[in-house]
Amino acid sequence: EAMDISHAAPFTFGSKIIAGDYKDLKDAGIIIITAGANQKPGETRLDLLEKNVGIFKGIIPEVVKYAPNAILIVAANPVDIMTEVTLKLSGFPKNRVFGTGTVLDSARFRSILGRHLGISPKSVHANVIGEHGDSEVLVWSSAVAGTTCVERLASQLGKDLDKVVKGSIDNEVRNA
């Protein structure tokens, strides 16, 4: 979780994050749901579906009870399906239930690419598209630092950004 939070640093603006009880959700405007089973080696995100649906069947009614007007953001795997599960379990309208999709993956991509180039991830603009997970795509062709293509910047800085390095970054983003 700490790694996820650090990878999300480019998006933070002084948020208040606490660990508490369901009753602490009273009057919450936005609730981020990260609960779920851990992915074991060899398991796919889809393998987590049955376990996480069971977990959500216990969580979502409590969330609805204490925060019936909140916006829900789902960040549990498989995130796209769990967002739909949350929508159905909550009974909330579609405009109040969102999944993180590849937002965290894009933040990881920016963070890891920034670290590799030795620059702030806040200067890196790079996206991951598609379904969160094994089929997601890192969009290298539009990755920039400021207004400079990352390949050009890497060359100017004397940093490798060849197929091997890109593969390593891709692997780190997917498997973080």
Predicted regions and their residues:
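C-terminal substrate-binding/catalytic lobe of Rossmann-fold NAD(P)-dependent dehydrogenases
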Residues: 90-96, 104-176
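Rossmann-like NAD(P)(H) cofactor-binding subdomain of soluble oxidoreductases
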Residues: 44-110
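N-terminal glycine-rich phosphate/adenylate-binding segment common to multiple enzyme folds
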Residues: 39-41
